[in-house]
Swiss-Prot record:
PROSITE patterns recorded: RADICAL_SAM
Main location as per UniProt: cytoplasm
Family: Belongs to the radical SAM superfamily. RlmN family.
Origin: domain of life: Bacteria
EC number(s) reported in the record: 2.1.1.192
Keyword terms: 4Fe-4S, Cytoplasm, Disulfide bond, Iron, Iron-sulfur, Metal-binding, Methyltransferase, rRNA processing, S-adenosyl-L-methionine, Transferase, tRNA processing
GO cellular-component term (any): cytoplasm
Reaction(s) catalysed by this chain's protein: adenosine(2503) in 23S rRNA + 2 reduced [2Fe-2S]-[ferredoxin] + 2 S-adenosyl-L-methionine = 2-methyladenosine(2503) in 23S rRNA + 5'-deoxyadenosine + L-methionine + 2 oxidized [2Fe-2S]-[ferredoxin] + S-adenosyl-L-homocysteine; adenosine(37) in tRNA + 2 reduced [2Fe-2S]-[ferredoxin] + 2 S-adenosyl-L-methionine = 2-methyladenosine(37) in tRNA + 5'-deoxyadenosine + L-methionine + 2 oxidized [2Fe-2S]-[ferredoxin] + S-adenosyl-L-homocysteine
Disulfide bonds: C103-C329
SUPFAM superfamilies, per the entry: Radical SAM enzymes
Species this protein is from: Gloeobacter violaceus (strain ATCC 29082 / PCC 7421)
Protein name, as recorded: Probable dual-specificity RNA methyltransferase RlmN
Domain (Radical SAM core) ranges: 96-324
Length: 348
């Protein structure tokens, strides 16, 4: 199958256009139609000769199909997108007064199987291609009728298990769509060796590490794959990342009532992060059907935050968006084309 055009750089598009016997300026036209106008078929490119459009009409652009979308009261919109093979992912547009953020997925499902995450309970099918990642941003721009300003890789999947496609997508989002690297965040639960590998690209993105526990024993209960990546090794790799990129690391910490939200957990977390160039994002657990964890009360959440700050750790509580439409952090799922949620034992 021909590689989709979406996700290719300006130089790659020039090479393709010239390989078709066309002048280089046609690549500039193609670039504009792909990344500014969001074309879905080459037949739509009206400033190309009709004869050539007909000649290349079967070359895939790489746009996904919007199967359904649902809006929350706060303006958040969740999209269910289907790829060419029928596999689906969810992506979320999160509007604010002066910004529009897209929460993008990097895989169909997720193999990390975190106990408190809906995606982790829905099984894993495959990695997304560069075009499928970039398409999510274009879809949200089209849906909201405004430019996307921020991108967070916090949707379905573990980005560092699809690092090649993610890095190429980052370059397209930055260089071809015009989103600043510092407005892009990549979240990871941690994959041995991959944080250091990401650091070698010297990108100015924000790395967000899903920690969720202050010690290895508790983290292993919440994140089964932590058995391959001791928390001490994870933190050492994060320190290396800070030194290599001169960018601080954000640590994500989902607060689960009675599990990891006690004052002693906050003190233990402060101890392991002391001296770290970092920030802690506290995320009150967003309920998932069939999972026994509970969301702590507001007072408990604020007490945890105060304890971290008291120990000189920069911390803040993330405001939940899209909760009633299951579009909040940890709530995205693999689904069938009908919108039915998938589990690890079912296939779309």
């Amino acid at each position: 199958m021909t590689t989709p055009l979406l996700g290719q750089s300006a130089e790659e598009l020039r090479i393709w256009v010239e390989s078709q016997g066309q002048p280089a300026y046609r690549a500039q036209q193609l670039h504009r139609w792909l990344y500014q106008r969001g074309v879905r078929s080459l037949m739509e490119i009206t400033d190309w000769p009709k004869a050539w459009r007909e000649q290349v009409h079967s070359v895939p652009v790489g746009r996904s199909q919007v199967v359904r979308q649902s809006a929350a009261a706060d303006g958040t919109i969740k999209y269910l997108l289907a790829g060419a093979d029928g596999e689906t992912v969810e992506t979320v547009g999160i509007p604010a007064a002066e910004r529009l953020t897209v929460c993008v997925s990097s895989q169909v499902g997720c193999p990390m199987a975190c106990r408190f995450c809906a995606t982790g309970q829905s099984g894993f099918a495959r990695n997304l291609g560069v075009h499928e990642i970039v398409d999510q941003v274009l879809t949200v721009q089209e849906g909201f009728g405004r430019r996307v300003s921020h991108v967070v890789f916090m949707g379905m999947g573990e980005p560092l298990l699809n690092l090649g496609a993610v890095v190429q997508a980052l370059r397209v989002l930055n260089g071809d769509i015009g989103i600043g690297q510092r407005q892009i965040t990549v979240s990871t639960v941690g994959v041995p060796g991959q944080i250091r590998r990401l650091g070698t690209y010297k990108l100015q993105i924000t790395l967000a590490v899903s920690l969720h526990a202050p010690n290895q024993d508790l983290r292993l209960k919440l994140i089964p794959t932590a058995q391959h990546y001791p928390i001490e090794e994870l933190l050492e790799d994060c320190r290396d990342y800070v030194e290599t990129t001169n960018r601080r690391v954000s640590f994500e910490y989902t607060l689960l009532a009675g599990i990891n939200d006690e004052p002693h957990h906050a003190r233990e977390l402060a101890a392991i992060l002391r001296g770290f160039q970092s920030h802690v994002n506290l995320i009150p657990y967003n309920p998932i059907e069939g999972v026994e964890y509970e969301r702590p009360g507001e007072a408990r959440v604020r007490a945890f935050e105060r304890e971290l700050v008291r120990h000189k750790i920069a911390a803040s509580v993330r405001h939940t968006r899209g909760l009633e439409e299951a579009a909040a952090c940890g709530q995205l799922r693999r689904r069938s084309l009908s919108g039915e949620a998938q589990s690890a034992s079912t296939r779309a």
